[in-house]
């Protein structure tokens, strides 16, 4: 059976002189009927509109579509090598079985491909599951800014429900989605999910939208401390990641 095609988006962010964030590219893993795999990289409209963005090394032409039979070095370098002794722990933190490693794009999207040396973030394009529902796994962001969050997280268990709360008055991002446990602030959903979650909260029956603890990684850095799972309905006509900055610049890439 041919594996399904996979898509992750690439976002760029900056904090100075003011916070800004945009999707700037997409990376697809495409399979032929024979199971042959190729990777396709292309820039999106966000790369042309967000101030300060520079093209990735080796892929400087915003209008070009880049293809390769192996993962591009700029993304391969964002994955921990399998030869490293901590690789098994890295897979476990991300919710994968170390004895059955996932496809590289699945791991890249789950781990977000974050490096301290740049402002790039990688995340998966949400797709409906086999039941036609929205299911997404993500790490809680912003834990370090909440004074009691780390201690509160240490008492959570898989399956615990979290409260999802909009923050329209948030001065940084009016689309921010906060996460709480028994009234205690833990952090936020990733920014790349916030607008879609807003729509799901508006269009899905309240009982179908749930965020639960998938696992707590007490020995992990804060950015990988709390892995959550979100379940929701998939409304008719719902298209995640459909704002202008997600649209491909090249006409050779399907929208």
Regions found by a protein language model. Give the residues of each.
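Conserved active-site motif detector
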Residues: 1-255
């Amino acid at each position: 059976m041919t594996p399904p095609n996979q898509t992750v988006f690439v976002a760029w962010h900056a904090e100075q002189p003011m916070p800004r964030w945009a999707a700037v590219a997409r990376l697809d893993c495409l399979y032929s009927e024979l199971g042959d795999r190729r990777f396709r990289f292309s820039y999106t409209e966000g790369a042309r509109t967000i101030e300060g963005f520079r093209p990735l090394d080796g892929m400087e032409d915003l209008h070009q579509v880049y293809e390769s039979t192996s993962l591009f070095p700029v993304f391969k370098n964002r994955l921990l090598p399998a030869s490293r002794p901590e690789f098994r722990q890295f897979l476990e933190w991300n919710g994968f079985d170390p004895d059955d490693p996932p496809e590289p794009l699945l791991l890249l999207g789950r781990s977000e491909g974050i490096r301290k040396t740049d402002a790039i973030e990688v995340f998966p394009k949400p797709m409906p599951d086999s039941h036609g529902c929205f299911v997404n796994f993500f790490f809680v962001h912003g834990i370090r800014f909440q004074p009691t969050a780390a201690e509160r997280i240490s008492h959570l268990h898989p399956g615990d429900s979290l409260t999802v709360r909009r923050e329209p008055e948030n001065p940084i991002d009016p689309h921010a989605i906060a996460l709480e446990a028994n009234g205690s602030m833990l952090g936020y959903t990733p920014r790349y999910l916030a607008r879609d979650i807003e729509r799901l909260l508006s269009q899905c029956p309240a009982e179908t939208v749930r965020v639960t603890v998938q696992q707590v990684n007490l020995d992990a850095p804060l950015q990988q401390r709390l892995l959550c799972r979100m379940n929701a309905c998939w409304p008719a006509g719902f298209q995640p990641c459909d704002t202008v900055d997600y649209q491909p610049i090249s006409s050779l890439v399907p929208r």
